[in-house]
Amino acid sequence: MRLGSIMPLTALAAVAILLAAAVAPAANAATKPGAKCTKAGVTVHVGNSDLRCVKKGGKLVWVKVSSEGASGENSSSITSNASIPKVIQNWGLALEPYDAATGKAGVMQIAGVTPPTFSNPADTAAYSRIVGLYGDVVLGILEPQMAFIAPLGTPVISMLDGTVCDLPQLYSNDYSVRVAPKGMACMTGGAPILFEHEHLISPLVKVGDKVRAGQRLGTVSDYMSNWKAKGMGMIETGVFFAKAGSNVPWHACLANYLAPSKKSSMTNVLTSIENGWIAVRNDPGLYSLAAQNPIGCLTQDDITDSNTGVK
């Protein structure tokens, strides 16, 4: 959710506490059919039954899963991030290598963009990057998604071919379009693997729609008031998966799942954007390419929605 780069850090600690509480393991009486849950698609084993978090009547609740559909590691979960397919064909925006002559990288504006500044240097630093990286650490909090800053009105496009399995409205009054890869069926309220296009407005798809890579899903969100004042919006992209044996949501680094035919061009694009931003801002400390492996990943750890990482 790239919390470290989208809100002043004075609010960050409180949000982290709320997130941690929201997804803490529920191995108690609260985990029962009909009780509230927090992440669609997560399945837990309680007693002799499996419970799955699904959306019913506009709310997320635990429901009992029939024995035909959820035993062990079948459609409800995967063993590890190694089971996530390499299917990503773009970064969620129509990006190109940075062109110093135009100051743009496809739909992203690089030259002439000035990030917000604050009296607190830590807040200023948190807003300093035009692309947020998976595994970035802000006040000890790991970021589980990537973030891209782009002009207001910029189209968000599907990263892959697949099915829209979830489309929740978020706390920020915008949306997340969550797409299961081609060949994976939706479960009620989600899927074991979901590629996230998070914080977009004016969604153009609905749950159940088949989408193609490059298809417009919506528009970059304007919810970040400090960037909005600069004429800029944002989108976060990530990959969620339900890990067998765990009842918390997990994320892996998106850049590990690029389609082989697109990997070279996509990594070149991201490298050129980072280098372009360094040049425009005249600040070599904004990105360390050597610290990213692959580009876009500052860690290979899986990260939970409580912003903690585990290998």
Mark where each language-model region is.
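Secretory targeting and sorting signals
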Residues: 1-29
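Acidic, glycine-anchored pre-beta loop/turn
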Residues: 203-211
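Zn2+-dependent peptidoglycan hydrolase active-site motif and core
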Residues: 158-204, 226-238
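Disulfide-braced loops of extracellular cysteine-rich modules
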Residues: 36-40, 45-47
